[in-house]
Design a protein with these regions (language model features):
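General N-terminal leader/first-domain-start detector
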Residues: 1-42, 229-237
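Charged/polar, solvent-exposed surface patches and flexible loops
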Residues: 15, 19, 36, 40, ...
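Short, charged surface segments at domain edges that flank catalytic/cofactor-binding sites
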Residues: 18-61, 83-86, 90
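Histidine-centered nuclease catalytic patch
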Residues: 61-94, 98, 103-118
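Conserved, surface-exposed functional patches that form binding/active-site neighborhoods
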Residues: 107-110, 114-184
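C-terminal, charged low-complexity interaction regions
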Residues: 154-237
């Protein structure tokens, strides 16, 4: 999971979403009215999906697990809990079908004392404040209550394919960095530029970001990456 930038709505789309929200309010804001309104909103959903595609890490990856293709518009705060947020642009994220339908569903843990959400919203906060990714193992450690809840709801550590995918992605990133170093040293700057672009499009954007963050601790980065990959990383950041 990485931080994301939410683009603004057009005035036309913002007005359309507000109109549909008001219709839910007038009909009675229930789970049923919210879901019915969402099912029939084909054209606004298509435009929202286009905007969400602009936010996604890598090649249209799920904003939660980062591993699978983002196919579903997820309501961060579920319709069952907040029907009036059905058409709230700030409540929409792109999820894979598995995270949306099998893991999160209507789950939305909150702090029992304050009522604040305990899931990380990557569009409003930096997941690295709550999650630490161990690159060698591919596993996450929760640093806060939000981090622990997010790991639990999306099964970020208990889905073996996610952990293995992150671990293998780290191997790929190191190989690409070494190749970038080799190509640059040989004067093949065109291929080196393609490699740098490939790093930005890897399916596991959280792994790439965790590698870039190693520059905060350069002695550790050199040990973890090796000399050639470390040299490439320092040149690219």
């Amino acid at each position: 999971m990485i931080p994301l930038q939410r683009p603004p709505l057009t005035d036309q789309l913002e007005a359309e979403l507000a109109r549909r929200t008001e219709a839910i309010r007038k009909a009675g804001p229930t789970t049923a009215t919210g879901r019915a309104a969402w099912r029939t909103a084909r054209e606004p959903k298509a435009r929202l999906r286009t905007l969400l595609h602009r936010m996604t890490p890598g090649l249209l990856r799920c904003m939660y697990c980062g591993d699978n293709l983002g196919t579903d518009i997820d309501h961060f705060e579920p319709i069952a809990r907040a029907p009036l947020r059905t058409f709230d642009w700030h409540n929409h994220l792109l999820a894979c079908a598995y995270c949306n339908s099998n893991q999160k569903r209507d789950r939305f843990p909150t702090d029992p004392a304050s009522g604040t959400p305990l899931l990380i919203d990557p569009a409003t906060e930096d997941p690295a404040d709550h999650l630490l990714l161990y690159l060698e193992s591919g596993a996450y450690q929760g640093l806060t209550a939000k981090g622990h809840a997010t790991i639990d709801v999306f099964a970020l550590n208990s889905r073996a394919e996610l952990v293995r995918g992150r671990r293998l992605a780290f191997t790929v990133v190191k190989a690409l960095l070494r190749d970038w170093h080799t190509r640059t040293t040989a004067g093949d700057h065109a291929t080196a530029a393609e490699i740098a672009d490939a790093l930005d499009l890897l399916w596991q954007a959280d792994v790439v970001r965790a590698v870039y963050r190693l520059t905060d601790n350069r002695p550790l980065a050199e040990v973890v990456l090796g000399p050639e990959a470390f040299t490439a990383l320092t040149a690219l950041t």
